[in-house]
Amino acid sequence: MFNFKKFALTLFATVLLSLGVVIGSYAKSSPDTLVFVGDYLGQLDFIEGRLLDLLDAMPQERMAWEPADGVRNTAEVYLHVAESNYSLASKMGADVPKTERGTIEKSTTDKEKVAETLKESFTVVKEAAGNLTDEELNKIIQTPFGMDMSLRNFMISLLNHMHEHLGQGIVYARVSGVIPPWSDKQDSDSDGDGK
């Protein structure tokens, strides 16, 4: 015979235990942390998409092009972002490739390998950022360039850094005769000439 009272108590206990696990995982983070991390992840998605779209539009033969001696070539611009992403992720506690500074950005000019490395670096940063607590975000760290700042500030600084190199990539693309895909789409949607 079905015992409704026993069933209801079991169901109630299961729900309480489940809620305890969910609430416990968020108890270490404030609502502000969840908002910051969510916003940060959204910004990472945006910049990753722009960088990968621009890289995809660039021809392979322009990957080794550099505007002047001693200036990063096209592939190095994207790989520099990837290397910086790994630096950021390491400060977040992620397991990242152990390399000398500057090694990743000079590792290849193969467009497919550049794209793969860039994607992997964003994945590592997103996974690490998604698990941060208030305490971790507010922790003072020493950056690779010798400055002390909170992890939160370092994350924002490296987001700015990504945008800086997106701008550099846009210039390289334009000089190479490549229209950034999102600009071309906006211009064609508004009956512009795509330039």
What are these regions (language model features)?
Residues 1-5:
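N-terminal secretory signal peptides that target proteins for export/translocation
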Residues 10-22:
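Bacterial N-terminal signal peptides
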Residues 23-27:
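Juxtamembrane cytosolic interface motif at the C-terminal end of transmembrane helices
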Residues 28-49:
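Short N-terminal segments immediately surrounding and downstream of signal-peptide cleavage
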Residues 41-45, 52, 62-103, 142-195:
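Short, contiguous alpha-helical
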Residues 107-142, 150-164:
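Acidic/histidine-rich alpha-helical segments that form the ligand environment
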